[in-house]
Amino acid sequence: MNSPIDKLERKLGYQFKDAGLINLALTHRSANSKHNERLEFLGDSILSFVIADDLYHRFPKVNEGDMSRMRATLVRGHTLAELGREFDLGDYLKLGPGELKSGGFRRDSILADAVEAIIGAIYLDSDIEKVRSIVLSWYNSRLEAIKPGVSQKDPKTRLQEFLQGRRKPLPVYTVTNIKGEAHNQEFTVECEVAGVDKPVIGKGTSRRKAEQAAAETALEQLTNG
């Protein structure tokens, strides 16, 4: 009889030799004193390397700035959370009662962190070449679609250029809340933008990420509204 983890492994395209690693990768700090943050730290570095290496060889004539922007697009929390949802990762996460109640299994930051932790776990369970092949299989369609150029500018830059092009004042970002312990904080930022009726809210694990999230939402409202 197949276990839930067997089903997840099929979605990931990798079967763990050490089941303890995948279980640890799925354990949020709210659920246990042994949690996935160290694996997340490892996976973050591995992901950045694998994507940078692929972009370097895929785009031999593209400069460092464009490669950095493409990598940032591919490894940002929103993209990782999309991957997590493709794997139905929220169904497998181990969360504490508070996070369960607040819908943590749907939260971008928790899904993104778990994807990075799984990458770290696969590396420890195998080797760098295996984890490279797995990560590239997950990213295949995104790597095929990505192109250097303006679309890779971060949301804050794109919002600023959008407003400047229309002779509008620049956005104002204000941190309205910081919660959590120093190593596991969530920032809430309000972004006031000309042309948007009320401040746009963004959340993230750093001030910068929260500002980028707010800018992305503001751009969507300005261009779709």
Swiss-Prot record:
> Which residues participate in Mg(2+) binding?
40, 113, 116
Q: What is its EC number?
A: 3.1.26.3
Keywords attached to this Swiss-Prot or TrEMBL record, sorted alphabetically, are: Cytoplasm, Endonuclease, Hydrolase, Magnesium, Metal-binding, mRNA processing, Nuclease, RNA-binding, rRNA processing, rRNA-binding, tRNA processing
Q: Which SUPFAM superfamilies match?
A: dsRNA-binding domain-like, RNase III domain-like
Cofactor(s) needed for function:
Mg(2+)
Which Pfam families has this protein been placed in?
A: dsrm, Ribonucleas_3_3
Q: Indicate where this protein resides in the cell.
A: Cytoplasm
Q: Which reaction does it catalyse?
A: Endonucleolytic cleavage to 5'-phosphomonoester
Q: Which EC class does it fall in?
A: hydrolase
A Gene Ontology cellular-component term? cytoplasm
Q: Which NCBIfam families match?
A: RNaseIII
Function field: Digests double-stranded RNA. Involved in the processing of primary rRNA transcript to yield the immediate precursors to the large and small rRNAs (23S and 16S). Processes some mRNAs, and tRNAs when they are encoded in the rRNA operon. Processes pre-crRNA and tracrRNA of type II CRISPR loci if present in the organism.
Listed under subunit, the entry gives:
Homodimer.
Please report the name of this protein according to its UniProt entry.
Answer: Ribonuclease 3
Q: Which gene encodes it?
A: rnc
